[in-house]
Amino acid sequence: MAVFPWHSRNRNYKAELASCRLETVPLECGDYHPLKPITVTESKTKKVSRKGSTSSTSSSSSSSVVDPLSSVLDGTDPLSMFAATSDPAATVTVTESSRKKRDKDDNSFVGPDFEPWANKRGEILARYTTTEKLSINLFMGSEKGRAGAAASAMSEKVRTRLEELDDFEEGSQKELLNLTQQDYVNRIEELNQSLKDAWASDQKVKALKIVIQCSKLLSDTSVIQFYPSKFVLITDILDTFGKLVYERIYSMCVDSRGALPDHFSPENVNDTAKETCLNWFFKIASIRELIPRFYVEASILKCNKFLSKTGISECLPRLTCMIRGIGDPLVSVYARAYLCRVGMEVAPHLKESLTRNFFDFLLTFKQIHGDTVQNQLVAQGVELLSYLPLYSPAMGWIFQCVSYHAPEALLTEMMERCKKLGNNALLLNSVMSAFRAEFIATRSMDFIGMIKECDESGFPKHLLFRSLGVNLALADPPENDRLQILNEAWKVITKLKSPQDYINCAEVWVEYTCRHFTKREVNTVLADVIKHMTPDRAFEDSYPQLQSIIKKVIAHFHDFSVLFSVEKFLPFLDMFQKESVRVEVCKCIMEAFINALTLEDEKRMLAHLINGFIKMVSFGRDFEQQLSFYVESRSMFCNLEPVLVQLIHSVNRLAMETRKVMKGNHSRKTAAFVRACVAYCFITIPSLVGIFTRLNLYLHSGQVALANQCLSQADAFFKAAISLVPEVPKSISIDGKLRPSEPFLLEFLCNFFSTLLIVPDHPEHGVLFLVRELLNVIQDYTWEDSSDDKIRIYTSVLHLLSAMSQDTYLYHIDKVDSNDSLYGGDSRFLAENSKLCEAAMVQILEHLKTLAKDEALKRQSLLGLSFFNSILAHGDLRNNKLNQLSVNLWHLAQRHGCADTRTMVKTLDYIKKRSKQPDMNHLSELALRLPLQTRT
């Protein structure tokens, strides 16, 4: 490789600084000032055409200039509202319209306080399972729907639609029998995938047939225990279909005007999209059976937005009435649940249909206890206690939708209607699960009365009390009723024979007891739990509930001594006989009261407190006493690294305060004192563990020593830092994670170079001794192959050596003669400087050569341009070889099309601008030799 000599350009730092200063411009009193008060000008705009072209007129007491921003507004601009306070009528109008809009928006969206259906889906699938065999009808995929040419006449289209649907209903299906639950789920997933595949291949009729077939499955209650899970699986397919249809029609609305806005109106929808939408509704209307017609139309309910503003509000009541034709009460209630779910998604503000669904359900509620249902249960061998919980997911969802943000009067009416029905335990449980906790809590005694009147045979009372307890854990009942509520509930709970039923209820009511009563009542409850769970070691099957009880108790007892004074608390802990559970419970108690920290956290906390104390201690001008305090502190806290770091910083600050007091002119006494401070730091730093902490403290302490004219001590610090660089590991731990160390090493070395500029050479060592030692260490350090930090360091070395070759350095330390004063342009010094520069250049160019690979061309381009900029800033380009090297680097940066064109253009413009400065004519010739790469 050819050797390029380095020639530093001469710098006049004062002149460069003066040329970089901002130009001062006198500001007259009447001119604009950024802090001048803002004057609001009312702008009124008048809408001229539908396309949004406006003509605006502005009125102002101070100016008649038209506001350019007002031309794009359709109405009053927001800032003018505040300026229009002089017109009370306008203010009232704006306020009223804003209130109405806000109220409408509040009802148009479902907030985060509404639990979504997705949260209930997994729970339903896990709870409602079966071991019985299932059957399913699979669509075999007739091709008739896609055959033949498109009919032109309307009657032909209608006949074609009916034939396509009849083809499905007349035998294009296959019944699969004796399926396990998992097989059934897999078949449903296959149907879901078939729907997506058919849609993707533009077989829309086939997709509709699949959805119809799936909807028909919801009329089958042959395996009644599995029906809620079947409903979840089938409605997933319906949701997919509805989404596909909506997105298809929405995509058809994209034209030259762009896509539809989020809140579009039917006027924005083109005729093609409307016709397609109507076609879907006509096809669905052709379905003969009620249940599939209902479900498929409900799934695309949102598409009514494309046809009419009132389409959804008109369809919801009609679909609600359609459900009245479904005879099976279980199928009916889930149909209502699906309609409520779709309604809440597309039009949550339409509360009437939700309320109508609820009251229609109440009218048919007695069917649950009718002969038809009883005969069906007998035929399937299902007991009423197992049948009634099947209604819970659907009823809970309906109640949740109706009660969401419902007024108090409606909730009261709903409760009264439920109260009038017989055998209403199921209804009561749904009310307590869905209504607001505050509503339930304020009427706790009313609900207890209703629970007492319920028939035990239909729905267990302990489940009702559990639901009531859940609400009372979230909201407080009237204070006068609290004890009576606990007594009434516990009378029922304590009589439960099943340990599992008992603990499920007791777990909920323990929190109510802890919230509102003393340790006496809590002790009584714990004693009752021990009494019920100890026989036959029943507690072994209920560890999660028992752990929950412990957490609730300790959450309300903030005093450790009070908790352990509860007589039955320790016997309660004795029930945790499984070792892992016992450890977990004890850990929970310890964290609640002791807040035990890990060892490292504890050290960090102690160190933080000690450091705060050290910084507060001051002996005024008695600096020697201050240093003695720091020496004593070091001996006491030698195991706490953060404290040692703080002590080193404090001693360095003490040395600088001494310099400040002496104004840089040390006496014999103060000179000895600052040397003692420097020695303190030099002795303490090696005891630290963190390598970058040591490196930075060596550098910082060396700077302090240099500022106090302790030159030999400063050299010792810098030599120690240089000798420590080879020990830097490849990665370091930061916040428990391993990070590469090279970026931190690069940052440290760049700071070090800035200090080395002003460090004078030791008379007994060679020229630039510290720089040569540091370059040797950098050369021997093992760098990552994928990293360019080594070359960035060598580039920084070039910057340092260029600054060192100047007649006068950029900055100095007071009363310290740097090398510019010591050598005064000596040829031996400059020759050594040039030698080191050439060595650094060789390293840079060799690295650039190794990057001539496809995967490294981008890095080569960036580094080449960076080195070019370094030569431009620090090199003397009047030298022909250096000039040629810069041209080569320019071409290298652009060779493979990896360079950023904007950066190259700006760089070239900068060169041309600099060429106009005095003694910079040679840059004009350089600019002519630097072509810009064109991309075609």
Swiss-Prot record:
Summary of the function given for this chain in its UniProt record? Acts as a component of the retriever complex. The retriever complex is a heterotrimeric complex related to retromer cargo-selective complex (CSC) and essential for retromer-independent retrieval and recycling of numerous cargos such as integrin alpha-5/beta-1 (ITGA5:ITGB1). The recruitment of the retriever complex to the endosomal membrane involves CCC and WASH complexes.
Subunit description: Component of the heterotrimeric retriever complex formed by VPS26C, VPS29 and VPS35L. Interacts with VPS29. Interacts with COMMD1, CCDC93 and CCDC22; associates with the CCC (COMMD/CCDC22/CCDC93) complex which contains at least COMMD1 (and possibly other COMM domain-containing proteins), CCDC22 and CCDC93. Interacts with WASHC1, WASHC2A and WASHC2C. Interacts with SNX17 and SNX31.
Q: Where are the transmembrane segments?
A: 672-692
Modified sites of kind Phosphoserine: 265
Cysteine disulfide partners in this protein: none
Compartments, record wording: Membrane; Endosome
Q: Which UniProt keywords apply?
A: Endosome, Membrane, Phosphoprotein, Protein transport, Transmembrane, Transmembrane helix, Transport
Which superkingdom is the protein from? Eukaryota
> Region entry Disordered: which residue ranges?
43-69, 87-113
- The answer, when asked if NAD is one of the entry's keywords, is no
Q: What is this protein called?
A: VPS35 endosomal protein-sorting factor-like
Report the sequence similarity comment from the record.
Answer: Belongs to the VPS35L family.
Gene source species: Rattus norvegicus
| Signal sequence, renumbered to the chain | none
Q: Name one GO biological process term.
A: protein transport
List all Low complexity biased stretches.
Answer: 51-69
User: Where would you say this protein principally sits, based on its record?
Assistant: membrane
Annotated membrane topology is:
Single-pass membrane protein
Pull one GO CC term from this UniProt entry.
endosome
